[in-house]
From Swiss-Prot:
UniProt organism field: Archaeoglobus fulgidus (strain ATCC 49558 / DSM 4304 / JCM 9628 / NBRC 100126 / VC-16)
Membrane topology annotation: Multi-pass membrane protein
Protein name (database record): UPF0132 membrane protein AF_0736
Family: Belongs to the UPF0132 family.
Subcellular location(s) per record: Cell membrane
Keywords: Cell membrane, Membrane, Transmembrane, Transmembrane helix
Amino acid sequence: MCYTLGFVTGVLFLLFDRSPFVRFHAVQSTLTFSTITALVILLPVLPGGALLSRVVMAFSIILWAFCIVKASRGEAFKLPIFGDIAEEQLSLNYT
C-alpha cells in the first residue's frame, strides 16, 4: 500500500504506521517517487529533456507496478540507492 499513490502514500504510512516492514517501504517509496516526480517536472527544461522525461515516466510506471507486487506479497526487497538510504534513515531513527 505504501506505493499506491507514489510518495504521497509513502509519507502517510511513515506518519501513521509503526511496523518496521511498512516503515521501510514507506521511506523507500517516498525517496524513490519524489525523486522521479522531480525529474519528470525538471527534465523538460533541458534540450531533449521532454523525451527523456517521458522515458523516466515509463520507467517509473514499471517500477511502481514492481514495487506494489513485491510489497503486497510481503517480500522484503531493496531498490538500489533508495533502499540503502531508507535503511540508513530508519536505523538513525531507532538508535
